[in-house]
Amino acid sequence: MKKDIHPKYVEITATCSCGNVIKTRSTVGHDLNLDVCGNCHPFFTGKQRVVDTGGRVERFNKRFSIPGSK
């Protein structure tokens, strides 16, 4: 096995925009700033919004439908 070919695996701190601090290990070598984490992501917090695209689909079908096809 070759020596000194693997990157250094060091402890880093990942800080989320919500203020949550996560200590982990990585080969990145520097601290990270996260946009979202498990504490503030809508999927994990239960604050999901359902996006209604029904109006867009109807508008698309109306715009690109072939006249007399129905």
Curated annotation (Swiss-Prot):
PROSITE patterns, sorted: RIBOSOMAL_L31
Molecular function terms from GO: metal ion binding; rRNA binding; structural constituent of ribosome
Superkingdom: Bacteria
GO CC terms in record: ribonucleoprotein complex; ribosome
Comment on bound cofactor: Binds 1 zinc ion per subunit.
GO annotation, biological process: translation
Cofactor: Zn(2+)
One Pfam family of this chain: Ribosomal_L31
UniProt keywords, alphabetically: Metal-binding, Ribonucleoprotein, Ribosomal protein, RNA-binding, rRNA-binding, Zinc
Annotated positions binding Zn(2+): C16, C18, C37, C40
Coiled-coil ranges (or none): none
Subunit architecture: Part of the 50S ribosomal subunit.
Role summary: Binds the 23S rRNA.
UniProt cross-references to HAMAP family, sorted A to Z: Ribosomal_bL31_1
Family as reported in the entry's similarity comment: Belongs to the bacterial ribosomal protein bL31 family. Type A subfamily.
Protein name: Large ribosomal subunit protein bL31
